[in-house]
Design a protein with these regions (language model features):
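Short loop/turn segments that flank or connect secondary-structure elements
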Residues: 1-218
């Protein structure tokens, strides 16, 4: 799930983003990214999607999660041109590619372009959200990995994870437009990363400076 997926589902079903996460997903810390990720959790003996109705139809078909809407097309973002690990990732560093996954459904009678396939669910080919999502999650991943490598206390890491989870996934009002809220959250989180790198640079210059603490970062 991305933040946009959760927001769209919550708005469609008349629920809060927190309720959608509780009912349809689980939160874990990414193995390599080291930031909170929200995964959909299958339910029942048949391990079916929690968004399916009893008749087998999707309850959020017109705003289904991006991964579902894109299938069998996949979307991959790569970070290029970042030579310094402390260099902030920006949208100019992100390159998006589309791939076609193996599939065995459909009649193959109709041909689609990437643009027309994405347009079915109002996903633009040049997707500003996806670029900004990639940027902020990449910057957060670098920051948290470095904090773990520097052996920050577990309580501090838990505080950071809670902040990331709340700002990135939860703190949205479905009565308001999504993008302005996401852009604000992304800027706050990118600012947190910049503050961490700034404090770390100061520590490198003066080894007598204590390890950055969360109150300093915030």
């Amino acid at each position: 799930f991305t933040a946009r997926d959760i927001y769209n589902i919550a708005k469609k079903l008349g629920k809060t983003t927190e309720h959608v996460i509780q009912e349809c997903g689980e939160v874990s810390i990414g193995y390599s990214s080291r930031i909170p990720l929200v995964h959909m959790v299958p339910i029942g003996l048949q391990r079916r999607c929690p968004l399916l109705r009893d008749d087998g139809r999707c309850s959020v078909h017109d705003c289904k999660p991006t991964a579902c809407a894109l299938f069998p097309v996949g979307r991959v973002a790569s970070i290029e041109g970042v030579l310094d690990k402390n260099m902030e990732v920006t949208k100019d560093c992100v390159k998006v590619r589309y791939v076609l996954n193996d599939f065995n459904c459909g009649s193959a009678k109709r041909h689609n372009t990437i643009r027309s396939w994405l347009a079915r669910f109002q996903i633009p080919e040049e997707d500003d959200f996806f670029l900004e999502w990639t940027v902020v999650t990449a910057n957060l991943s670098v920051m948290v990995n470095k904090m773990e490598n520097l052996h920050f206390p577990s309580r501090t890491l838990e505080m950071v994870w809670n902040i990331i989870f709340s700002l990135l996934y939860v703190n949205y009002d479905t009565g308001k437009e999504f993008m302005p809220q996401f852009e604000l959250a992304a800027e706050q989180l990118n600012a947190l990363c910049r503050k961490f790198w700034s404090l770390e640079a100061e520590e490198t210059e003066d080894s007598s400076i204590d390890k950055p603490k969360m109150p300093d970062l915030l």
